[in-house]
């Protein structure tokens, strides 16, 4: 286990405020569970993350890259549904892996992630990239349940073409420590990203949530909406950034953290 820094802000502020990043006691994943796909028609093994994929930290990204890699390509004008289930087991309590998604022009995908397990201690480190071509539509639901006393690192990167739409919905209900690092690039005109996260943390659970969306394409739209409840000594850290180029003043953005 080593101390690292995670979820550093893209533009740092005064260090004495202690908001630029977070300290984390990081443990590399050990024996890895398997990722189970509900449909393998569009799935192949292997793949490489984009070179500018940063992740929560260099260490957490390296951990994910040491695991198995999968590539999912949805062909042009194809509609598909896919569920990826990862369950911590007695002899394989951890998980590390990379997932590369590409939606070709006009493709649509409903993607569900399910992370679960009753192991008292697990480390999950995932890194997922999403490339949406023109008019592609992606809906992602992310559900964590169980996994007591576990550390969950969810790292993702998305690039959208013209009029592409991406909707992330996360239910952060499991894990002792949850770290989310999400970067989106609205590269195409009239592209849209919506990030919605719901959480309910109790006991000593902690959440460190990072969202950054760059507006590059004209008339792009972004929403970051985080809501939930804390009880006992549970805590949450939220870092959200919506960056708009001065040449694209018609971009629309909403940021909410409750």
Mark where each language-model region is.
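Conserved beta-strand/loop scaffold segments within soluble protein domains that form the structured core
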Residues: 53-256
């Amino acid at each position: 286990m080593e101390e690292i820094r995670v979820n550093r802000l893209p533009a740092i502020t005064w260090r004495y405020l202690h908001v630029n990043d977070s300290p984390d006691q990081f443990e590399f994943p050990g024996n890895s569970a398997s990722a189970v796909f509900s449909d393998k028609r569009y799935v192949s093994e292997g793949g490489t993350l984009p070179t500018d994929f940063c992740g929560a930290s260099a260490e957490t990204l390296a951990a994910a890259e040491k695991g198995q890699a999968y590539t999912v390509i949805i062909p042009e004008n194809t509609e598909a549904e896919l569920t990826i289930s990862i369950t911590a087991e007695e002899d394989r309590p951890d998980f590390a892996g990379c997932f590369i998604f590409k939606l070709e022009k006009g493709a649509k995908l409903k993607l569900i992630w399910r992370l679960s397990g009753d192991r008292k201690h697990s480390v999950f480190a995932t890194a997922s990239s999403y490339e949406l071509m023109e008019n592609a539509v992606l809906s992602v639901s992310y559900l964590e349940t169980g996994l007591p006393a576990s550390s969950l690192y969810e790292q993702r990167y998305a690039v959208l073409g013209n009029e592409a739409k991406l909707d992330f919905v996360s239910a952060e209900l499991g894990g002792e420590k949850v770290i989310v690092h999400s970067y989106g690039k609205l590269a195409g005109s009239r592209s849209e990203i919506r990030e919605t996260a719901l959480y309910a943390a109790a006991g000593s659970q902690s959440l460190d949530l990072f969202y950054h969306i760059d507006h590059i394409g004209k008339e792009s739209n972004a929403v970051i909406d985080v809501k939930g409840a804390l009880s006992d000594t549970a805590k949450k850290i939220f870092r959200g950034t919506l960056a708009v180029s001065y040449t694209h003043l018609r971009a629309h953005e909403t940021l909410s953290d409750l």
